[in-house]
From Swiss-Prot:
Organism this protein belongs to: Deinococcus radiodurans (strain ATCC 13939 / DSM 20539 / JCM 16871 / CCUG 27074 / LMG 4051 / NBRC 15346 / NCIMB 9279 / VKM B-1422 / R1)
The protein's name: Holliday junction branch migration complex subunit RuvB
Binding site for DNA: 302, 307
Family: Belongs to the RuvB family.
Primary site of residence: cytoplasm
GO BP terms in the entry: DNA recombination; DNA repair
Length: 333
């Protein structure tokens, strides 16, 4: 059997041409890659940021493939000490290779400081011994490209940010872009997917390719059990409804967020910590998981005084703007 992560890797586009969406970023990245190839140089260090599941890891692999080099994948939490970093830089990289660090904002501070000369001068300072007898030796490194990915760019320190020559933001995908990608996946996996069904899955995927691919697998499960070799619109709608996703892609947790904000806090403003406590979540989860998509839909606003529900949120939940149904047909402000 093929594990989902191996399946995702097999379906991952290898080139910028195969990659669907992020058109502005692709245009710029295409120029940078062509220039680097023409000069036979490593690509400038690149920082990719945006919500989870938008393709930062995929783009890192595409960069390596387009440059014809190897990629070494690690994550910020895995690099706690300078020794962890030294092992990666000295044992795993060859000239021009790509080092991809996911969640780079979680890189240990001491390790981060040792990364600066590696990024800037392609050298690594190693301290041998302790106390007065300690001495520093300088190890030359191959010229490599660091690709960092983060969902929290505000946590990237200024010294680290300044060492990236390319900094790009990934946007949410349209339903059409997601459908195009899902149709490709279905073709590669050998089952049918109607375009309307692809659009339906795309519309309920929170603009996120990773979620769309997960939903496609679940919808396919329902189709397989029903003995269907092609996923049509009705099957997609039925399966997605059973998965608890509404027409905008909101699940029960998203609705709980909005309903708590509206019913318990009169639509806001309310602080994120208070709201998190009310729905038994932590504030970081709200900020990283729930809120980006709700803001994208125009359902909430972040204000200096706290979170506020918009008229679109009331409308989506079937409530008149600014009012709350008390259960007796009376709307309270």
């Amino acid at each position: 059997m093929t594990a989902p992560e191996n399946l995702d890797a097999a379906l991952r586009p290898k080139t910028l041409t195969e990659y669907v969406g992020q058109e502005k970023l692709k245009d710029k990245l295409g120029v940078y890659l062509q220039a680097a190839r023409g000069r036979r140089e490593a690509l400038d260090h690149t920082l990719l940021f945006g919500p989870p599941g938008l393709g930062k890891t995929t783009l890192a692999h595409i960069i390596a493939y387009e440059l014809g080099v190897n990629i070494r994948v690690t994550s910020g939490p895995a690099i706690e000490k300078p020794g962890d970093l030294a092992a990666i830089l000295t044992n795993s990289l060859e000239e021009g290779d790509v080092l991809f660090i996911d969640e780079i904002h979680r890189l240990g501070r001491v390790a981060e400081e040792h990364l600066y000369p590696a990024m800037e001068d392609f050298k690594l300072d190693i301290v041998l011994g302790q106390g007065p007898a300690a001495r520093t030796i300088e190890l030359p490194l191959p010229r490599f490209t660091l690709v960092g990915a983060t969902t929290r760019p505000g946590l990237i320190t200024a010294p680290m940010r300044s060492r990236f020559g390319i900094i790009e933001h990934l946007e949410y995908y349209t339903a059409e872009e997601i459908a195009t990608n899902l149709l490709r996946d279905a073709r590669l996996l050998g089952f049918g997917l109607d375009e309307e069904a692809g659009l339906e899955i795309g519309a309920r995927s929170r603009g996120t390719m990773r979620i769309a691919k997960r939903l496609l697998r679940r919808v396919r499960d329902y189709a397989d059990v029903a003995g269907e070799t092609t996923i049509g619109l009705e099957r997609a709608q039925s399966a997605l409804d059973k998965l608890g996703l509404d027409s905008a892609g909101l699940d029960d947790r998203d609705k709980k967020y909005l309903e708590t904000l509206i019913h318990r806090f009169a639509g806001g403003p309310v602080g994120v910590d208070t709201l998190a406590t009310a729905i038994s979540e932590d504030a970081l989860t709200l900020e990283d998981v729930y809120e980006p998509y709700l803001i994208q839909l125009g359902f909430i606003k972040r204000t200096p005084r706290g979170r506020v529900a918009t008229a679109h949120a009331y409308d989506h939940l079937g409530l008149p703007p600014g009012g709350i149904d008390d259960g007796n047909g009376i709307f309270l402000n």
